């Protein structure tokens, strides 16, 4: 009989399957293929399970309880066995034998005795619970976004607030000490009382320093968690935005918006929020000040409407100027990115002086915008300082009259003046931080432009099953912008599984648009795109794209090794599979000639490789995960004739068992296709085999004659 340990270890990727089981137990949709695609090609470990659990709406926490405490653990949970596999710990059944109910992926539930379970279990549990509602991710991003985040960390926030309250009460002791010293010690020459007060004052100082350090640590810890959460959400959201979002914006503008995260981070991790807490807790000091003197307290409080009026007048001006500063900064960022990206063109055209003049002009505009912001901030700070000085003068004058009239003692006046400082100083510091606060508001608005855009990934969309390769376009029309002409107009096309279809036509005829709709990079304005009978408009786009292989006209390579670039969609691919894909793409020979072969690190976008070499690596990358549908969008246009000949020679093997769409300007690239579709003006002009289209004497025949003439 097979032991429980062996049975559990033999289940492939038991961690992933256990997570899916628990997600479905909690009523959450979880697709194992989608999770494997997003998080790991190899077996899930505990850390990967925790990450994937967030994706499906679960919170998972690692726990190592003592065996005696296991019956009190929240179940069901995922348990780790001694062989590194996972199983579901369902429940402990009451009784003398303390039976344990477990379930291994793909098997029926099993009852184990306590000793048998302890022999199986490695001591680690992954406790699972439903996370916040998935609809929470769709909430608008503004300052209210931090409310659920603060609720999530409410225990830490509560500790910070409690410490802040204690610090305010400690701060109350300092004025009282001074009052006692001036009214009792100095008048009566009570040195023993002075020594007692000094010891008490020293203890208060040390305790205050300790609590301040603890508060700073707790606040920095909480702020860092919020910072990580916001940064992770921003990047994940950016990756899930549709292609149309990026095409409608310059790269530099998007980068500038992402960089606004730095302002929010600085605000969260700086002293701004502690100042806000001090302002809130100043109500304690105001209450004590009323106890000392109502008249003096009213003098101090009379300044608060002045601060408010100053803010009311200057805030709109400051906000407008901050908007101008951001826009100028975004223009600079976009221009810089554009310059660096196109530096070869700038140098080849020798337009550096013109670019330098443009940069100087834009930089001057940005500096001027920054100076205008600084001027408004300086005016606000000057106004606040003036008001605070007038308040100090009023307190001194009114307080002196109260002392002369013997309605206050000198010690009480000094204590009141110190208490009023605890009210006015946070307000003054808040005014000095007002520029940062407004900058943070602008940053939130700019980041909201990204985070409030709807993504193309929706958790409630159906997962596409394994493809057979049937593609149908049913009266499809599409335009890139509402005010633009149709890029595709009433296109209907059927492609059978395993069929090789070539798509040709003049530039701008809609060839690439056709394949982008099949990839669901864009959604058709009218009509439907169906794959294996499934309308791709209502399926999860990732479940579609991971079954497609796409090679664009220019393949983007990343700053990693050749092997990693080829195995990008299958990080767990073996070296044999990588080499097989490279051979099929005609890339193996030149890769072997690189300094470190497949381990050679490539520069950004494959710098150092020729266009043809980059393209062949791109083709190998598209083939590595054995897609059922392969799209070659001008994939051989950058190849020399020898490289193209290698690809054409391997085309039969490349196309074997899959549906292939070949877009090409060179008609020789589609001659092997089962069927050729000729596009013209966004419509299907002709369709048929190479010989049929030549015999028809239409657009395809004219294009063939033109290319034959050029070749001649």
From Swiss-Prot:
EC number: 3.4.22.-, 7.6.2.-
One MF term in the entry's GO annotations: ABC-type transporter activity
InterPro entries: AAA+_ATPase, ABC1_TM_dom, ABC1_TM_sf, ABC_transporter-like_ATP-bd, ABC_transporter-like_CS, ATPase_T1SS_HlyB, P-loop_NTPase, Peptidase_C39
Annotated positions binding ATP: 505-512
Domain Peptidase C39: 7-128
Domain ABC transporter: 471-706
Alphabetized UniProt keyword annotations: ATP-binding, Cell membrane, Cytolysis, Hemolysis, Hydrolase, Membrane, Nucleotide-binding, Protease, Thiol protease, Translocase, Transmembrane, Transmembrane helix, Transport
GO biological process: killing of cells of another organism; protein secretion by the type I secretion system; proteolysis
GO CC aspect terms: plasma membrane; type I protein secretion system complex
Domain of life of the native organism: Bacteria
All copies of domain ABC transmembrane type-1, residue ranges: 157-439
Localization in the cell: Cell membrane
Keyword Transmembrane helix appears in the UniProt entry: yes
Protein purpose: Involved in the export of calmodulin-sensitive adenylate cyclase-hemolysin (cyclolysin).
PANTHER family named in the record: ATP-BINDING CASSETTE SUB-FAMILY B, BLL6336 PROTEIN
Stated name of the protein: Cyclolysin secretion/processing ATP-binding protein CyaB
Originating organism: Bordetella pertussis (strain Tohama I / ATCC BAA-589 / NCTC 13251)
């Amino acid at each position: 009989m097979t032991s429980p340990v062996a049975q559990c270890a033999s289940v492939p990727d038991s961690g992933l399957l256990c997570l899916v089981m628990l997600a479905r137990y909690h009523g959450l949709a979880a697709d194992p293929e989608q999770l494997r695609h997003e998080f790991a090609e190899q077996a899930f470990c505990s850390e990967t399970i925790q990450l994937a659990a967030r994706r499906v709406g679960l919170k998972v926490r690692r726990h190592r309880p003592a065996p005696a405490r296991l019956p009190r653990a929240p179940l069901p949970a995922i348990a780790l066995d001694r062989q590194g596999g996972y199983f579901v710990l369902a429940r402990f059944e009451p009784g003398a034998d303390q039976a344990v109910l477990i379930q291994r992926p793909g098997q029926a539930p099993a009852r184990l005795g306590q000793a048998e379970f302890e022999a199986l279990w490695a001591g680690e549990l992954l406790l699972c619970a439903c996370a916040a509602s998935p609809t929470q991710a769709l909430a608008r991003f503004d300052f209210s976004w931090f409310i659920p985040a603060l609720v999530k960390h409410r225990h830490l926030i509560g500790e910070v607030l409690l410490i802040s309250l204690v610090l305010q009460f400690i701060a109350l002791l300092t004025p009282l000490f001074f009052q006692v010293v001036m009214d009792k010690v100095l008048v009566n020459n009570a040195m023993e009382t002075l020594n007692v007060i000094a010891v008490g004052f020293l203890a208060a100082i040390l305790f205050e320093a300790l609590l301040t350090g603890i508060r700073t640590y707790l606040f920095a810890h909480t702020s860092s968690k919020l910072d990580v959460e916001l940064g992770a959400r921003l990047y994940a959201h950016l990756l899930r935005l549709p292609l149309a979002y990026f095409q409608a914006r310059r790269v530099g503008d998007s980068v500038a918006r992402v960089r606004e995260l730095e302002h929010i981070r600085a605000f969260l991790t700086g002293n701004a929020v502690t100042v806000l807490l001090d302002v809130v807790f100043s109500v304690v000091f105001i209450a004590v000040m009323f106890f000392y003197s109502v008249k003096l307290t009213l003098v101090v409080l009379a300044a608060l409407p002045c601060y408010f009026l100053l803010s009311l007048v200057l805030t709109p001006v400051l906000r407008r100027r901050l908007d101008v500063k951001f826009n100028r900064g975004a223009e600079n960022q976009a221009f810089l990115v554009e310059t660096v990206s196109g530096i070869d063109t700038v140098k080849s055209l020798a337009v550096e002086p013109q670019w330098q003049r443009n940069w100087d002009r834009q930089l001057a505009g940005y500096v001027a915008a920054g100076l205008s912001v600084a001027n408004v901030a300086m005016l606000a700070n000057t106004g606040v300082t003036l008001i605070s000085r007038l308040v100090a003068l009023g307190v001194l004058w009114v307080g002196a009259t109260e002392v002369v009239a013997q309605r206050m003692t000198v010690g009480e006046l000094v204590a009141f003046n110190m208490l009023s400082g605890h009210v006015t100083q946070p307000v003054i510091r808040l005014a000095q931080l007002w520029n940062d606060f407004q900058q943070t508001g602008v940053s939130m608005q700019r980041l909201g432009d990204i985070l409030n855009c709807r993504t193309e990934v929706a958790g409630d969309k159906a997962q596409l099953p394994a493809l057979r390769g049937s593609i149908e376009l049913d009266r499809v029309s599409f335009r890139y912008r509402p005010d633009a002409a149709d890029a595709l107009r009433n296109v209907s096309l059927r492609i059978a599984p395993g069929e090789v279809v070539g798509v040709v036509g003049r530039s701008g005829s809609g060839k690439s648009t056709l394949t982008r709709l099949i990839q669901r990079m864009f959604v058709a304005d009218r009509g439907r795109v169906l794959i294996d009978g499934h309308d791709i408009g209502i399926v999860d786009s990732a479940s579609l794209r991971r079954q497609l292989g796409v090679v664009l006209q220019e393949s983007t390579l990343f700053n990693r090794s050749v092997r990693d670039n080829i195995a990008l969609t299958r990080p767990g691919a073996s070296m044999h599979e990588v080499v097989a894909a490279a051979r099929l793409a005609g890339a193996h020979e030149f890769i072997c000639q690189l300094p470190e072969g497949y381990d050679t690190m490539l520069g950004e976008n494959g710098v150092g490789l020729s266009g043809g070499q980059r393209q062949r690596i791109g083709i190998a990358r598209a083939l590595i995960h054995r897609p059922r549908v392969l799209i070659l969008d001008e994939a051989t246009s950058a190849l020399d004739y020898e490289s193209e000949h290698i690809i054409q020679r391997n085309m039969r093997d490349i196309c074997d068992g899959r549906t292939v769409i070949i877009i090409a300007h060179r008609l020789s690239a589609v001659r092997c296709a089962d069927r050729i579709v000729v596009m013209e003006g966004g419509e299907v002009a002709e369709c048929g085999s190479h010989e049929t289209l030549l015999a028809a004497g239409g657009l395809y025949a004219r294009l063939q004659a033109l290319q034959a003439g050029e070749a001649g």
